[in-house]
Amino acid sequence: MRKTITGLLAILGLLLLSSGTSSANEGSIAFVGARIIDGTLADPIEDGVVVITDGRIRTVGPRSAVTVPAGAQIIDVAGKTIMPGIINAHGHVGGTLGLEGGHYNTDNLLRQLGLYARYGVTTVNSLGGDEEQGFALRNEQFDQSLERARIYVAGSVVVGNSEVEIRAEVNRNADMGANFIKVRIDDELGTAEKMPRNIFDALVDQAHIRRLPVAAHLFYLDDAKYILNSGADLVAHSVRDLPIDGEFIDLINAKGVCYIPTLTREVSTFVYESEPEFFSDPYFLKEAEPAIL
């Protein structure tokens, strides 16, 4: 299984970097012989071909049905799997270096986004803590020479003690060009006061006036149901106090809301009680920061 995952992610990184340079080569690149999962729920394509021309994927299909352009660079990827880039729907980029905070800068953003790309993650939604440098990189990423993951940003996590304050904070992030509005509504396990519901309602209203989706950090099932009925667009964490019930499932389906369970984040709260298996995985260790280990 480890070899399969390694092969899959390695070819994702190869596709990302090669597609960014093909325009400079003024030609096409054909990845030949892979299993291809196209993300549409269709059956995998065996012995497939992906053709990239001028930095864009032009053709995907079985070898028998794809004509490789004359003069194309051909890369044999037999035994590997190609799939669409992975999306990190809830991340935070650029703020840490090793175990230290306070390192939000362009170089650190580029370092982390490059690491994402090398492991097959091609898009990151950064939901909070984003500063001007992150917005600038977001604005520069629509270029086929890109050699990192794309980033979409929320700006600062929105807080306010009144409806007037919360609307002003939404407007501040919107004026910066945020892609989302991020808010925490829980009590941080009893250490803080929950956001009053009238203030959350005002936040949602103002965000939607500014045509921005609302991503809500939460913990409790009753809050999850409330924000769904109030108009939240992304549930940014798992419900963690109770098992979800039929009412919650029906609400998610009826509202068409994105549910981001952040399961790996939850695993991180207990997996280090003993040494996890991936600490001996060469693929993980290749780019793991020594300060974290």
Feature names for model-found ranges:
Residues L16-S28:
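Bacterial Sec-dependent signal peptides at the C-terminal "C-region" and cleavage site
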Residues S156-D205, Y226-N229, L234, E289:
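Active-site gating/metal-coordination segments in enzymes
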Residues A168-T191, V239-L293:
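Active-site neighborhoods of metal-dependent hydrolases
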Residues F142-A154, M195-A216, I252, G256-P261:
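Alpha-helix-loop-beta-strand connector modules within alpha/beta enzyme cores
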Residues G27, I36, A42-M83:
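Histidine-rich, glycine-flanked metal-binding segment
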Residues L109-E132, R148-S156, M176-E188, P213, ...:
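Divalent metal-dependent hydrolysis catalytic cores, especially in the metallo-beta-lactamase
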Residues K80-S145, N161, D222-L234:
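Metal-associated gating/positioning segment near the N- to mid-region
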Residues G7-S18:
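Bacterial N-terminal signal peptides
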